[in-house]
């Protein structure tokens, strides 16, 4: 999908593939870069090195965490703030409740009148009025009198106890009480829930429905929140047909764009799309100009002749990570273009899904207050079969749960998206684990939200 704002990013397919060279002067202390156009082919092509060195997943994550961009803020109505990240701390300026109130339906009385009440010598009090929520009873409560009170109604002056209806015996306009009651019983005090001056929500909190209720109760109707991270999606490939189009000839239909857009929205990002961009350096570079915090490129991340994106990023910005020790998604790239954090995800759909969850999604989730953890419910279960891996590589294995045991979904290829559809979730085999044995307990990340 292409947003209206992205119409200026379109680029015709018929351009000659040529690489515009840039010289990069990078200030490593501020992580900013200045670029001067040279108009010539780069002397060093990062693709020619292949993947001689692959970073560990931990190294890639550390690089991302050091480059998380900052977000601007905006003020929005309280009722629209669910799941948004609070930009500043909020302190209550009022007591909640702001008055003494009855916490039960019953009778407001003076505890001193009941001091000697017993079964053999009950105390009889005359009911002299009623008090309802929002309507205070202005006259002080006299000794040996009672006032019928509803839950939440203000306590009458001098009343310091509420006796529930079920604890008294009614006789016309009188109540009979056969036991003493401690002062303050069933009476809510000012500031009992929130005292004036209390820090109620800290900056950086992801706002929940109960938070909205509390903020409303202290008189707040709008909040300052972090803007949603703007994420621009660039899908490359001359072989791609638009999403939802039946495949034909030697073309394939774009599966990654709609999948990534859904993932970005799930993690709280605001997504725009350049649509399908041809494998042309100028077209890709033009798509990079979107005013966003994060750019995600699907396809063109490896070292093939048409994989221009790593070289473009190396020349025009900073290619911090290219190649990660994991399967699938090993051709992942991560870098900086001007102020934008850029993720290069493989074109194979399962690699794309895995690379998003581990890397791009992590950055978006941290920016939206969801935390860095994978956004899936976890379950510990035994393996129903062995799983082969190699030490030094992290593996992402799609699995099914059958009769309480975990087995692989086959085939496991990086292009086999149906394997993820048929899977209940996935298992991550750590770099240290190597192969896993039948019966070994593993954590399954279920393909369902936490």
Q: Residues of each region from the PLM?
A:
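Intrinsic-disorder-associated, low-complexity terminal segments enriched in Asp/Asn/His/Tyr and depleted
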Residues: 6-8, 17, 27
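Flexible glycine/proline-rich
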Residues: 61, 74-83, 88, 134, ...
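Short, low-complexity N-terminal leaders and the immediately following helix N-cap/first helix
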Residues: 22-25, 32-119, 370-396
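Helix-rich terminal scaffold detector
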Residues: 35-40, 44, 50-54, 221-345, ...
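Solvent-exposed alpha-helices and their adjacent loops that cap or buttress functional pockets
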Residues: 100-102, 117-120, 138-142, 155-156, ...
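Short, glycine/charged-enriched hinge/interface segments at domain edges or termini
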Residues: 39-58, 107-275, 406, 410, ...
